[in-house]
UniProtKB/Swiss-Prot annotation:
Subunit structure: Homotrimer. Binds to both RNA-binding sites in the C-terminal region of Rne and to RhlB.
One of the protein's GO biological processes: negative regulation of RNA catabolic process
Single GO cellular component term: cytosol
InterPro entries: RraA (IPR010203), RraA/RraA-like (IPR005493), RraA/RraA-like_sf (IPR036704), RraA_gpbac (IPR014339)
Record family assignment: Belongs to the RraA family.
Entry-linked NCBIfam families: NOT-MenG, PRK09372.1, RraA_entero
Keyword Cytoplasm applies: yes
Main localization category: cytoplasm
Signal peptide, first to last residue: none
Protein name as catalogued: Regulator of ribonuclease activity A
Gene: rraA
């Protein structure tokens, strides 16, 4: 499904929170949306592998990587896993790598930056926790919509039709 965050903001102005414009699109989908699962991890993506092995239809993985751009939390292998398991998108408050491969995949990926250095894979982090970045507090179960213009958040799903 295609989302227009500008239009959604016009219609649902009182119901959405707008994330500060920190992110760029690195995935093959220009827009995506779904119910979020939150993750907090710093320069370690082991937990992301576990979560992205689950069916992701209708879901977006939202990762608070502490804003670190020293190590990439998502690479082509991890993004391929997410695509195979039908995740709608990934929002990474951190970095990604292998961006030429990422843009070929049918998944939305928003992140702060790209860097060639990979993350550790120890599995250190927590999921389903409250995270805060970009001026917005995120909870698992909230609904996120993203496109090349921005990212918005709603407690409830927005009627897109």
């Amino acid at each position: 499904m295609k989302y227009d965050t500008s239009e959604l903001c016009d219609i649902y102005q009182e119901d959405v929170n707008v994330v500060e414009p920190l992110f760029s699109n690195f995935g093959g989908r220009s827009s995506f949306g779904g119910q979020i699962i939150t993750v907090k991890c710093f320069e370690d993506n082991g937990l992301l592998y576990d979560l992205l092995e689950q069916n992701g239809r209708g879901r977006v993985l939202l990762v608070d990587g502490g804003g670190s751009v020293r190590r990439a939390l998502v690479d082509a292998e991890l993004a391929r896993l997410a695509t195979q398991n039908e995740w709608e998108g990934l929002v990474i408050y951190g970095a990604v790598r292998q961006v030429d491969d990422l843009e070929e995949l049918d998944i939305g990926i928003q992140a702060i930056a790209a860097i060639p250095v990979g993350a550790a894979g120890e599995g250190i982090g927590e999921s389903d926790v409250r995270v805060n970045f970009g001026g917005v507090t995120f909870f698992s179960g909230d609904h996120l919509y993203a496109d090349n213009t921005g990212i918005i958040l709603s407690e409830d799903p927005l009627d897109i039709e």
